[in-house]
Design a protein with these regions (language model features):
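Short, flexible loop/turn elements at secondary-structure junctions
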Residues: 56, 94-95, 133, 167-169
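N-terminal compositionally biased, intrinsically disordered segments and leader/signal-like regions
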Residues: 10, 104, 131, 149, ...
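Short solvent-exposed loop/turn micro-motifs enriched in small/polar/acidic residues
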Residues: 35-37, 121-122, 158
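Acidic/polar residues at beta-strand termini and the immediately following turn/coil
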Residues: 45, 101, 142-150, 179
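Active-site donor-binding loop signature of nucleotide-sugar glycosyltransferases
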Residues: 54, 131, 146
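An exposed tryptophan-centered "aromatic clamp" motif
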Residues: 71-89, 93-143, 154
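Extracellular adhesion/carbohydrate-recognition regions
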Residues: 3-88, 162-166, 173-187
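Disulfide-stabilized, aromatic/cysteine-rich ligand-recognition loop
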Residues: 146-175
């Protein structure tokens, strides 16, 4: 059964493989993000127009944090104007999913494989809090795993996780550092 917000999945089973011993395999079509390292501790995804902090909260604290502490972390980055911006926030579930790709490999704080671009710093957490709260039960918030690609609802106060912060990029404000000094061609 397909869920509306999941990518189209095609199942390849024993009929195609001809081996009754093999399990079915899911093949998911995905559009890879187009990441650019901005050289200031951030990475821009030019497909989604999001800018991400290159490392996550684990790199800052060396321990997991609650959902409320994740919001405090965003506020701290905004107060410091990290990379010159004061609009850092928790990502939504779809934004968090946009970093995930089985074709990408990085490693978390324990050396386990996570499926995000290797442009992001290694040694961070394997999952992230999102800003999304559970409808009708707001003690829970959604968390996304970069190991499995699954999301789960967790208690905001009793569960410890990590957070990858993001911000929206206004199309005119962002350009790679190398392009800033180039002249545009005029006829």
């Amino acid at each position: 059964e397909l869920v509306d917000d999941e990518p189209e999945t095609e199942w390849i089973g024993e009929e195609e493989w001809g081996d009754e011993e093999e399990e079915d395999v899911a093949v998911v079509e995905e559009e890879l993000p187009n990441f650019v390292d901005n050289g200031d501790g951030t990475i821009s995804d030019t497909r989604s127009n999001l800018m991400w902090k290159k490392d996550d909260s684990y790199e800052e604290f060396k321990y997991g944090i609650t959902w409320f502490e994740a919001h405090d972390y965003c506020e701290m980055l905004n107060d410091k104007k990290f990379a010159g911006y004061d609009d850092w926030r928790l990502a939504g579930i779809e934004e968090s999913k946009s970093l995930f790709s089985f074709t990408q490999a990085n490693s978390d704080k324990d050396g386990a494989e996570i499926h995000i671009s290797d442009l992001f710093e290694t040694g961070g957490g394997h999952n992230t809090w999102t800003y999304e709260e559970k409808p009708d039960y707001q003690q829970y918030a959604q968390k996304f795993s970069y190991v499995t690609g699954n999301d789960v609802w967790e208690h905001k106060d009793n569960e410890y996780s990590h957070c990858r912060v993001t911000r929206d990029v206004v199309q005119d404000e962002w350009e790679p550092e190398w392009r800033k000094d180039t002249k545009t061609f005029e006829r």
